[in-house]
Amino acid sequence: MTSFKIVIVCLALLVAVASARSRDMMSDDERDYHFSKRGIPCACDSDGPDIRSASLSGIVWMGSCPSGWKKCKSYYSIVADCCNQ
């Protein structure tokens, strides 16, 4: 009887997962806008040497810069890059 209950619960979970609706997909333009507004600001080399007065025109991306973005900091980091469009 216990194994029957386990089978019923597993089937119910399988149906719940299989019938889940996916979120509406954003267009590429909407996705680019949301990506550009997300993240931690960073100072590019063009912002100047003083971090306190810099405009922080870059955004930190984990890994490497996505397509359409370029690395704007001269030093190399394994974990993240400072990128701007």
Swiss-Prot record:
Domain of life: Eukaryota
Signal sequence segment: 1-20
InterPro entries noted in UniProt: Myo_ane_neurotoxin_sf
Pfam entry (one): Toxin_4
Cleaved propeptide residues: 21-36
Annotated transmembrane regions: none
Tissue spec. comment: Expressed in ectodermal glands and in clumps outside of the extodermal layer. Is not expressed in nematocytes. In adult female tissues, shows similar expression levels in mesenteries (gametes-producing tissue), tentacles, pharynx and physa.
Keywords: Cleavage on pair of basic residues, Disulfide bond, Ion channel impairing toxin, Neurotoxin, Secreted, Signal, Toxin, Voltage-gated sodium channel impairing toxin
UniProt record similarity statement: Belongs to the sea anemone sodium channel inhibitory toxin family. Type II subfamily.
Protein's name in the database: N.vectensis toxin 1 7
Source species of the chain: Nematostella vectensis
